[in-house]
Regions:
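Catalytic beta-strand/loop cores that center a nucleophilic Ser/Cys/Thr
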Residues: 25, 133, 138-214
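Extracellular ligand-binding/catalytic regions of CAZymes and related secreted enzymes
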Residues: 25-27, 34, 45, 49-57, ...
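Helical hinge/lid and interdomain linker segments adjacent to catalytic or ligand-binding clefts
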Residues: 32, 39-120
């Protein structure tokens, strides 16, 4: 099945439309920022293409993909409803740009982090407060079972109780478990916990969560290394739901 066929499938059977009460709202612009100061993921071009198509199919948002740091000014950010990071490393943002991003989210806009967004800004404590945790290795790159931690949450209710995916699996350190609502977590029985690189923590292996930063809605998915994950209709629907939630088109 081609990428376009995957996208057509999800648009026809599982894409979510905005709430009727907000149907006349103009398209929300979402800044998809893919600057890689560290490892650069091969999947970035595919991810941008799929997100762009999801926005078109949904009819609620428009994706603007960029690596231009100039977008992070108060004036430029004002053109967007949300910012989405698929980034790595210590991005060379100025203190003014960092403050602009924090104020943007605090004031009620959305922030979404994908995969290596937690492998970003280790030396900026406010970023940890924003996203909720840091990447701490990926002991597994395989087919795993993923538990739906809150099957009643609208972002993941369509998944049932669990799903299987083949992807690079992150473990998270410094996780703000009290301030985060975990939506998906690794089923520990589906992996080898005896590997030397495994760090067992009391909160396990959260893979998808949502949280708030000031008045802003924050979403993070550790999934998304593999192109096959991006082409999966379930992942596409999850991201569509997350964008609609972060931009306040859904509760």
């Amino acid at each position: 099945m081609t990428r376009r066929e995957f996208i057509t499938l999800v648009s026809s059977v599982s894409a979510i439309r905005p709430l009727d009460a907000r149907a006349e709202r103009p398209l929300d612009r979402v800044l998809y920022f893919t600057y890689s100061a560290g490892y650069r993921h091969d999947v970035l071009p595919l991810s941008a293409a799929i997100l762009t198509q999801l926005g078109r199919d949904c009819g609620a948002f428009e994706i603007i993909a960029t690596e231009d740091l100039a977008e992070f000014s108060t004036g430029n950010l004002g053109r967007y409803a949300a910012v989405m990071f698929y980034t790595t490393g210590e991005i060379p943002m100025s203190s003014v740009q960092k403050t602009a991003l924090l104020n943007f989210v605090r004031s009620g806009h959305g922030f979404l982090g994908i995969h290596s967004a937690t492998d970003t800004f280790y030396t900026w404590p406010d970023y940890l407060d924003l996203i909720g945790g840091y990447f701490n290795g990926h002991p597994w790159h395989q087919a795993v079972t993923i538990e739906v931690a809150d099957a009643a949450d609208p972002l993941v209710a369509f998944l049932g109780s669990s799903l299987q995916l083949n992807d690079e699996v992150y473990q998270i350190s410094d996780f703000d478990y009290r301030g985060s609502h975990v939506l998906l977590r690794l089923d520990q029985s589906s992996v080898d916990l005896s590997k030397d690189s495994v760090h067992q923590r009391f909160y396990g292996w959260p893979l998808v969560w949502k949280r708030f930063f000031g008045e802003g809605r924050v979403f993070y998915s550790a999934l998304g290394h593999e192109g096959s994950v991006w082409q999966d209709p379930r992942y596409q629907r999850l991201l569509t739901n997350a964008i609609l939630w972060s931009t306040r088109r859904s509760a």
